UniProtKB/Swiss-Prot annotation:
Top-level taxonomy: Eukaryota, Viridiplantae, Streptophyta, Embryophyta, Tracheophyta
Name under which the protein is recorded: Auxin-responsive endogenous peptide 1
Expression triggers: Up-regulated by auxin.
Subcellular location: Cytoplasm; Nucleus; Membrane
Species this protein is from: Arabidopsis thaliana (Mouse-ear cress)
Function field: Negative regulator of the auxin response.
Name of the gene encoding the protein in the UniProt record: AREP1
Amino acid sequence: MGLSDCLIYRLVVRCFLDYSICAPFYFYHKFMLSASEPVF
């Protein structure tokens, strides 16, 4: 397992964990904003 593979694996795991934690808050925030103004 090369160094690049290890970094990619850690990046994927970190992104997955961050997404699973932050996604509900992100979508809730986006939903609340969409009620008053468009979100890009």
